[in-house]
């Protein structure tokens, strides 16, 4: 059978192992072809091809449920659930999403883009199944990196106390999340990864005991436990952990041996209780470059399949904000041993890999544990350290209570750098960094800021570290503007001080962060129509520069705010609240992201759809304030 002929995963039923192996080769070929052309997650999917095929041969996906953690490893799933012909549109506007999405396919049973959610969701489905009296199977597939997340461990703890609830958790253990996994649990998994597979003692042990002369069917209580006792002696140490938590442990299993995987999954389904199947895979399997560099090939832009090298863009791009942040923090750490960089399993993505390489003693990776990262930093700040927590905007949402309870209320000097703030592009709604302005504005004691360019990022970083309370600095995804940066001598900003970039009397445009450059472009378009704009770089959303903004607004009487974040509770709302609190009755036109989910597309495509391109903003400003005359 050809992969292109698969329209339903149940077509895998009855295929031989050799036929499945042939389909596995076709999946890898298609996977590599598309990702090398348009970019996407590479290594995770290549590592679970055999696992996916074997698992789906043991399930009826018209009824059974599978929850894939994060979705990085979901490309093989998509290819065998009817999306082969559309796969060229992966992560493109109106195309196949990069993550599982319930609205895209009936086989995407649960959507996700953040880690560690799968076991909770699958357990919820299992409980719903049992209450309805149904009998479909529920499976969660989770990576060893995601297993470091507290939510996954909470779900395991809960499921283990439901011994009569059938649930299969497949641990995809490739010794790698996005960055190498950290922590005691990861070390524990490493100890057993190369252990011989554990073949569990079946109920025949108890049957054998029954056949002992003089005992027969009346088994003493002490002997009833013999099976469990012998099993615990045989279980590898990591298996013992899951056994103690109420799971039956199976493994470790070779994740590329389809026949053995099928047998193991069938055995797991028969147990009718919580089972953890430990599957050992190779991230990037089948593509030597991805196997050799599992971090670099976790996700890739377009690349040459023959050489494995990224295809350079036609136009050289300036260095990214993330790298500028990482390089600047390294310089600061070299000068101050009390400064410590903290990440939650995203060293490369946040730019902290340079700190990890050069000063590992001032670098901490907590794993996929954002809540812990925040409170860890809070504790460190109590005893004189200066923690800088670098987390994607979308992932910091997971630690909102810790921001309030552990940092804000106690007014602790913790610096947060929110990477990927604003519109991020092809990763879609699970990864858009559109909410941080809104959710952080409400927390007392926090200072919130965003730079207009790379140089201002450096100044804001030293400002944050020097501040005696909590700060949050948001930076956008991707390249900077090409503004020159300094190796040292960064001048701190005055907290809450904005700046006027251009003078004008017709319209006041107050822009925040990445939208300052767009505001300047918009002003040029307006100037061509004899409309002169006063452009203010707000720098801070909390506190606002009241002394600068209010007199300008009172004089010009027409105000526009620009932000790359959700409008509800955002920067524009802060300006409106400022005017309202000071009884200034001035029309304010807020430009930002409305109350919508921003789907996967390129950043510019998303901005165009939202009306955030300079030409669109200029036209809308003219219409809003009737400036045609």
Curated annotation (Swiss-Prot):
User: Keywords assigned by UniProt?
Assistant: Isoprene biosynthesis, Magnesium, Metal-binding, Thiamine biosynthesis, Thiamine pyrophosphate, Transferase
Please describe what this protein does.
Answer: Catalyzes the acyloin condensation reaction between C atoms 2 and 3 of pyruvate and glyceraldehyde 3-phosphate to yield 1-deoxy-D-xylulose-5-phosphate (DXP).
Family matches, as Gene3D superfamilies:
3.40.50.920, 3.40.50.970
**Keyword flag Nucleotide-binding:** no
Q: Which family does it belong to?
A: Belongs to the transketolase family. DXPS subfamily.
Example of a GO biological process term: terpenoid biosynthetic process
Could you tell me the superkingdom of the organism this chain comes from? Answer: Bacteria
Query: So where does Mg(2+) get bound?
Result: 144, 174
The record's gene field reads dxs
Task: List GO molecular-function terms, semicolon-separated.
Answer: 1-deoxy-D-xylulose-5-phosphate synthase activity; magnesium ion binding; thiamine pyrophosphate binding
Q: Which Pfam families does the UniProt entry name for this protein?
A: DXP_synthase_N, Transket_pyr, Transketolase_C
Q: Give the cofactor note.
A: Binds 1 Mg(2+) ion per subunit.
Q: What is this protein called?
A: 1-deoxy-D-xylulose-5-phosphate synthase
- The reply to whether rRNA processing figures as a keyword in the UniProt entry is no
Looking up InterPro entries in the UniProt record yields: Dxylulose-5-P_synthase, THDP-binding, Transketo_C/PFOR_II, Transketolase-like_Pyr-bd, Transketolase_BS, Transketolase_C, Transketolase_CS
């Amino acid at each position: 059978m050809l992969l292109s002929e698969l329209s339903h995963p149940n077509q895998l039923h009855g295929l031989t192992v050799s036929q499945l192996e042939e389909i596995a080769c076709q999946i890898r070929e298609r996977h590599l072809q598309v990702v090398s052309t348009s970019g996407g997650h590479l290594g995770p999917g290549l590592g679970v091809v055999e696992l996916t095929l074997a698992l789906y041969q043991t399930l009826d996906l018209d009824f059974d449920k599978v929850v894939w953690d994060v979705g990085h490893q979901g490309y093989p799933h998509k290819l065998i659930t009817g999306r082969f012909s559309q796969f060229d549109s992966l992560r493109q506007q109106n195309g196949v999403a990069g993550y599982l999405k319930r609205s895209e396919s009936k086989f995407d049973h649960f959507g996700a883009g953040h880690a560690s959610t799968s076991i909770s969701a699958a357990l919820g489905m299992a409980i719903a199944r049992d209450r309805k009296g149904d009998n479909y199977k529920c499976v969660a597939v989770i990576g060893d990196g995601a297993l470091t997340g507290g939510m996954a461990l909470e779900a395991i703890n809960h499921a283990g106390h439901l011994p009569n609830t059938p649930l299969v958790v497949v641990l995809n253990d490739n010794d790698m999340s996005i960055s190498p996994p950290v922590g005691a649990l990861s070390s524990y998994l490493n100890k057993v990864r190369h252990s011989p597979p554990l073949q569990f003692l079946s109920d025949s042990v108890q049957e054998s005991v029954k056949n002992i002369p003089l005992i027969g069917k009346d088994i003493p209580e002490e002997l009833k436990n013999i099976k469990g006792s012998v099993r615990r002696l045989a279980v590898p140490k990591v298996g013992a952990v899951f056994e103690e938590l109420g799971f039956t442990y199976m493994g470790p299993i070779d994740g590329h041996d389809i026949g053995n995987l099928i047998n193991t999954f069938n055995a797991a389904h028969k147990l009718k209780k919580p089972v953890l199947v430990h599957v050992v895979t190779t991230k990037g399997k089948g593509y030597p470059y991805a196997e050799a560099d599992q971090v670099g090939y976790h996700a890739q832009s377009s690349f040459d399949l023959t050489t494995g090298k990224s295809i350079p863009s036609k136009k050289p791009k300036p260095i990214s904000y993330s790298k500028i942040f990482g390089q600047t923090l390294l310089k600061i750490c070299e000068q101050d041993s009390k400064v410590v960089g903290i990440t939650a399993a995203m060293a490369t993505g946040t730019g902290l890999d340079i700190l990890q390489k050069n000063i590992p003693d001032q670098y901490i990776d907590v794993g996929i544990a954002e809540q812990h990262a925040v409170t860890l930093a809070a504790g460190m700040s109590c005893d004189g350290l200066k923690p800088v927590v670098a987390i994607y905007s979308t992932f910091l949402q997971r630690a909102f209570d810790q921001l309030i309870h552990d940092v804000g209320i106690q007014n602790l000097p913790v610096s947060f750098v929110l990477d990927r703030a604003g519109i991020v592009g092809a990763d879609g709604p699970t990864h858009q960094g559109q909410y941080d302005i809104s959710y952080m504005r409400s927390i007392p004691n926090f200072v919130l800021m965003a730079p207009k360019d790379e140089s201002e990022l450096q100044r804001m970083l030293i400002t944050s570290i020097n501040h005696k309370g909590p700060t949050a600095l948001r930076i956008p995804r991707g390249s900077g503007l090409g503004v020159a940066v300094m190796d040292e001598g960064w001048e701190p900003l005055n907290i809450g001080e904005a700046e006027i970039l251009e003078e004008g009397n017709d319209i006041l445009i107050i822009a925040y962060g990445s939208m300052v450059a767009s505001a300047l472009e918009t002003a040029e378009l307006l100037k061509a129509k004899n409309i002169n704009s006063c452009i203010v770089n707000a720098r801070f959303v909390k506190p606002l520069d009241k002394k600068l903004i209010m007199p300008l607004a009172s004089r010009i009487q027409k105000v526009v705010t620009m932000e790359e974040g959700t409008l509800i509770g955002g920067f524009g709302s802060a300006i409106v609240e400022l005017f309202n609190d000071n009884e200034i009755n001035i029309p304010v036109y807020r430009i930002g992201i409305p109350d919508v989910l921003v789907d996967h597309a390129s950043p510019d495509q998303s901005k165009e759809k939202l009306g955030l391109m300079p030409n669109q903003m200029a036209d809308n400003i003219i219409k809003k304030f009737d400036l045609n005359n």
